[in-house]
Amino acid sequence: MKKMFIAAAALAVVALANAQAPADAPYAVKSGVYTMSMDMMGNEMITEYYFDDYGKKTATVSEGGGMMMMGGDQGGKTRTIEVEGVQYRVNDEAKTATKMPDFGGFSGGFGGGQSQINWNKLTDEVKKANNIKELGKETVAGVECTKYSMTMESMMGSMDQTVWIYKGIQLKNEMNSDMGTFGSTCKKFEEKAVDASMFALPASYKVEEFQMPDMGGFGGF
């Protein structure tokens, strides 16, 4: 019995070693899903984030209404994925996809305030460039997060943010800019396996190029 216990313990150690995140991984969690809630002009927008391979594969699923401004579908659910460096908005019900342009690192889908910073590999250079300061620990969605303040430059101007990070994953944020104050909060977080199809674009789907929506009186832009 003792030998069996030692063997089992050894196997557990080996399994843990094999499960370590790669050096360049965005997250320190292998796979999972978390649900973010964001207030969009008085309406709650729910976005589900799926990830695998320690954050190297990601997908978001949102209700269509909040995606209208950036060329998404106006109804139903929209799945956003990246395939070979290109972002696609996928409507699985209609079996269609929209190939999105490069917004220069800006997430056009109001992605819960997710930033482009690799919080799992936070360097002194990144901290200095974004004026990042650690504020302590707080619990969000049942897990302990590290709280940071920061200032970022984006296409919307200078933006002050407070973010809550769990193993590289941003589970809460509050943003202040010239356009106002907004943010998002994780309502549920689960570490679990995610089906590979969540990150794939079926070959049978019809793919269309992104079309900038008609902005009416803003034709001068």
Describe the residue ranges of each PLM region.
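Sec-dependent N-terminal signal peptides
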Residues: 4-14
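Extended soluble regions of mature proteins
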Residues: 21-221
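Sec/Tat signal peptide C-region and signal peptidase I cleavage site
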Residues: 15-19
